[in-house]
Amino acid sequence: MRKFPGIANAIAAGLLLSAIFVAPAQAAPRDVTVQDTDVFPESIAATPDGTVFLGSLKKPIIYRAIPNADAKPWIHLSGNQPVTLGVLADPVAKTLWACVHEPVAAPSPTASTPPPQRSFLRGFDLETGAVKSNYPLAGATNGCNDISIAPDRSVFVTDSGNARLLRLKPGSKALEIWLEDKQNLDGIDGLNFLDGKLYVNNVRTSHIYRIPMTPDGKAGTPVDIALSQPISGPDGMRAEGGVIYIAENRGGRISALKLTGDKATVTVLKTGLQIPTGVAPMGKTLWASEAKFNYMRDPKLGNPNPFKVYAIPLP
């Protein structure tokens, strides 16, 4: 057999160079720890570069974690004892949307429930954190809970206190009541669009609904989604890759819903969480947070810290 030492040496050299210059595999995102105490985050958001945002139900602060770093205070909210529920990052509009709540009256030291709230949909610059916009919800008391962006760029908001969905059309200066349904939506919480269709959940009844939309943009009658197994206390809800991800706050679980028509197969992804309320899928990672509201209700439970956002790998 004739040998070709020059060719063999060239191949060997090429293989060696390939081994040297192959980029190392990118490390999977790690869990995020919040560098503050008593945060009690109700919602989280994420951007494609791996930045994570979260609000606080106890402090007037929105936190941010840059990729592979812990979360630190980022935005200090102005107003009357403001706190944050839903947050949503909108890279297209370069906006971080947040549901900001303020008490209507001072809390009573003997009251077992918080005072009535008024709330706002507030927009912040996604890079600097500067306030860009502020839209009050209709009514003397209300409860902005979560946010989603429609295909036409309208911003939809759930009003848990009034069983309503509100809409902010592109270019509009005010939120409008899009749907009010006390029979099905008394307890409306999370929402998201999937394949152009709007889905919402009811944290009290543990139902998922599809909200039909007429050609002229009006709301139809909610359609109850048939689930392959029960869920318990659906809260934060986000969709990506044809799947809806849900935080089950009473169930202590994170679940995935794969829809076929108006039926959904439920797959549990993570268990053992303390009142999970926020999810944010981004690429191959599902971010999920614990609110630990049980510690707010019962101080005898002790120290709730630290608060974390978990990075759950997706297939």
Q: Which functions belong to the PLM regions below?
A:
Residues P29-V34, A71-L77, A130-L137, A174-K182, ...:
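A short beta-strand motif characteristic of beta-propeller blades
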Residues Q35-V52, L57, G79-V104, L137-V155, ...:
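Beta-rich, blade/repeat-based domains predominating
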Residues L57, H101-P103, S160-N162, V203, ...:
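Short loop/turn segments immediately following the C-termini of beta-strands
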Residues P60-I62, A105-A106, L121, A163-L166, ...:
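Structural signal for beta-propeller blades
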Residues I66-D70, D125-A130, K169-K173, P212-G217, ...:
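Short loop/turn segments that connect beta-strands within beta-propeller blades
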Residues C99-P116, A291-P304:
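Short, conserved, GDST-rich strand-edge loop motifs in beta-rich repeat architectures
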Residues S112-D152:
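Asp-box/WD-like beta-propeller blade repeats and closely related beta-sheet repeat scaffolds
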Residues A280-P315:
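Blade-level signature of beta-propeller repeat domains, shared across WD40, Kelch, NHL, RCC1
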